[in-house]
């Protein structure tokens, strides 16, 4: 067995829960920028992200509203107008 006297404390990297939570929150916020992608936040994460209760739209209305974001994410040279100019 391991002798506790021979194991040095420097051999173990401590976990930094605050840093891990912040990294997870940053990843979720980046995912939230993807149109149509629904990211779930726990109450603590939502508060840190500056969230507030949404009372202006229903969840269904919010999900349907992402259709107009398609044009914002498509590069300009692949749109119909740019394709028609090349005829």
From Swiss-Prot:
InterPro entries: Conjugal_tfr_TraD_b/g-type. It comes from the Bacteria. Residues 76-87 have a biased composition (Polar residues). Keywords: Plasmid. Residues 67-87 are annotated as: Disordered. To plasmid R751 TraD. This is Protein TraD.
């Amino acid at each position: 067995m391991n002798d506790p006297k021979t194991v040095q404390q420097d051999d173990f990297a401590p976990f930094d829960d605050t840093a891990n939570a912040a990294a997870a929150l940053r990843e979720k916020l980046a995912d939230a920028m993807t149109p149509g992608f629904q990211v779930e936040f726990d109450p603590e994460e939502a508060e840190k992200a500056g969230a507030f209760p949404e009372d202006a739209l229903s969840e269904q209305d919010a999900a349907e509203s992402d259709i107009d974001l398609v044009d914002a994410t498509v590069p300009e040279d692949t749109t119909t107008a740019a394709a028609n100019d090349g005829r």
